[in-house]
A protein has these predicted regions:
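Basic, polar low-complexity surface loops/patches
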Residues: 1-168
């Protein structure tokens, strides 16, 4: 792959690639990304959570991890990944920087899978929906706010999911 093609692949969106040009695993990634374009998608592949294309570029920059590539020739896709056992650490860093993260897990044991391992979105984590005590500041609230307008005014609801507090 020449330098010009490599550079264009680094800035290319996985959504701009026709599905038939992708591997089955990359199509799984593309399907989740298509439905959750505002999220960084972390796809469990064996012992790693992997991010591709624009998400790989963002993760590499924000998490200070290596940006590499998967595939050969014209099909090379920017890739950044973290070991599965470090998910909470890296998820915390992304959440603190304001990112919304979609976690895609393997839904079956890869050793038992016939063909492509089934994967599915198991959760979306945002700064307002995180409930893991290890990812929260102990002495700070973590509110999420909802605003609804109607003909004669508006209403507000605020909740801290980590403590169960709810205000209207």
């Amino acid at each position: 792959m020449n330098a010009e093609n490599h550079q264009s692949r680094q800035t290319e969106s996985v959504l701009s690639i026709p599905s038939e040009q992708l591997t089955p695993g990359m199509r799984q990634y593309q399907d989740v990304k298509r439905q959750h374009q505002d999220c960084l998608v972390m796809l469990r592949m064996g012992d790693f959570y992997e991010m591709f294309y624009e998400d790989a570029n963002t993760a590499s920059r924000e998490l200070e991890i290596t940006l590499t590539a998967r595939g050969k020739g014209e099909r090379q896709a920017p890739l950044a990944g973290v070991p599965f056992h470090t998910l909470e650490t890296y998820l915390g860093k992304l959440i603190k920087k304001g990112y919304k993260v979609a976690i895609v897990e393997q839904l079956e044991d890869p050793k038992q899978a016939k063909g492509l391992v089934k994967r599915g979105l198991v959760r979306i984590v945002t700064p307002g929906t995180v409930i893991e005590s290890s990812l929260l500041e102990e002495k700070e609230n973590n509110y999420i706010l909802s605003v609804t307008s109607f003909e004669n005014g508006f209403s507000l609801a605020a909740s801290d999911l980590s403590t169960g507090e709810f205000f209207t």
